[in-house]
Amino acid sequence: MLDVRPDEVSAVLRQQLSNSLTEAQLEEVGTVLQVGDGVARIYGLTKAQAGELLEFEGGLKGMVLNLEEDNVGAVLLGEYSAIKEGSTVKRTKQIAFVNVGEGMVGRVVDTLGNPIDGKGPITGELYKMPMERKAPGVIYRQPVTEPLQTGIKAIDAMIPIGRGQRELIIGDRQTGKTTVALDAIINQKEFYDRGEPVFCIYVACGQKASTIAGIVGTLEKHGAMAYTVVVAATASDPAPMQYFAPFTGAAVGEYFRDTGRPALVVYDDLSKQAVAYREVSLLLRRPPGREAYPGDVFYLHSRLLERAAKINKSDEIAAAMNDLPESLKGIVKGGGSLTALPIIETQAGDVSAYIPTNVISITDGQIFLEINLFNSGVRPAINVGISVSRVGGNAQIKSMKKVAGTLKLDQAQFRELEAFAKFGSDLDASTKLTIERGRRNLEILKQPAFSPVSVEEQVATIYVSTNGFMDSVVVNKVRDFEKDFLTVLRTSHKDTLKEIKSGKIDDAITEVLKKVAKEVAVKYSK
């Protein structure tokens, strides 16, 4: 028999026991009283906090929204058919978060950040970003001074958007709202190719799965998925998933913003998010207000949109930002931005309804799309008269500001005079000129979907249009004139375009533009 050495045995036992935990593991557990329609009432979680994540049997996550005397009301984030009365629920003692990292770019994820595009798990380092977070304080922000080029002539010239701005896209259904937002995303490819990417997040809230698949296909076709994350909460997802989807999009955008990079988030659309929130609130028996929306529906959108900001350039100030997630400490950089393009759908052009007026008052301007313009072939169907950008003017490049300064006013005047012109033909010469030039400007501002125009080409085209070098061109030939004019500039005057891009516009540049315009106009004159 082998010699058994007691000291060795006791040493092994000591080593084994040193790794075992002897303290009692305390878990707060509650019981489901009632479940249905994506909402559960739970008894026993007396210490639960508002906004806290809960874990149900089978790993399903929930979130506490209502704290009542004898129970808590929670929303269920996912498929809840396995949850029954009497099921146990555990507190997690953390607020709802989503894991974000560089590996998320190019992927389609759900509200909880899980990939749903069949391309496997998200790789690389991931950081915990809270879904709900306080917006950066005034000290940590800086004014909007840098343009966010959309590639859409009508927007970049007359309703410019700056990095860190919130610009609402509003209009009836089928007026091209999503197309405007996708154009803005596709136009960022120029910056991606240059090595200065603007990371884009497209949040699809309550849309058909087939529509979302089409949008992802469009982005892939134009090479835009290389710098885009799609957050999808389809119409078939439970209301809580649709309600939280924009918050997930904001959390993803904040990761890029707080690490010193520009990001653009599109919320498509917030009307459906408000409807989902109304559903959740009514199921939780919160008192209804106007149009049966809960009283805090304004706060729902304001706290979401306030998270868009241009962060102070100083790394030191940015690192001291309020409500910074623990996971980001040490990698925070200044100078980042998050631009928001929320979309709102109106009913029969009624911008004075509850949700549209709320979001108009929160944002820094709106782009109003009109069904009549859309049907008459003006696309993008932007009504210039009631579309505004409250801060973007400071962000325009100098050359664009100089050239497009009067364009908005001219077009508003043209619309007014055109309405009068229908009643009588005896118009004086200056009125006729305004109408004729307005028609040509209108043609110049038309643009097919998914074909963004670079800023220097926009400046060149708008210069010749507003200064009357196209007055001799037949209206229906304006688009052909534009195509030829830009081709000549691209082939023979690359330096001029480069100077315009840098913001410069002087007599030498305008002489080149005049000369080329006159040469090309001969071909398309009456």
Swiss-Prot record:
Provide the binding site for ATP: G171, D172, R173, Q174, T175, G176, K177, T178
Give the highest taxon in the source lineage. Bacteria
Q: What gene codes for this chain? A: atpA
**Source organism of the structure:** Cytophaga hutchinsonii (strain ATCC 33406 / DSM 1761 / CIP 103989 / NBRC 15051 / NCIMB 9469 / D465)
Q: Which reaction does it catalyse?
A: ATP + H2O + 4 H(+)(in) = ADP + phosphate + 5 H(+)(out)
Localization terms from the record: Cell inner membrane
Could you say which EC number(s) this protein's record lists? 7.1.2.2
Q: What is this protein called?
A: ATP synthase subunit alpha
Note the Pfam families from the entry: ATP-synt_ab, ATP-synt_ab_C, ATP-synt_ab_N
Q: Where is this site: Required for activity?
A: S387
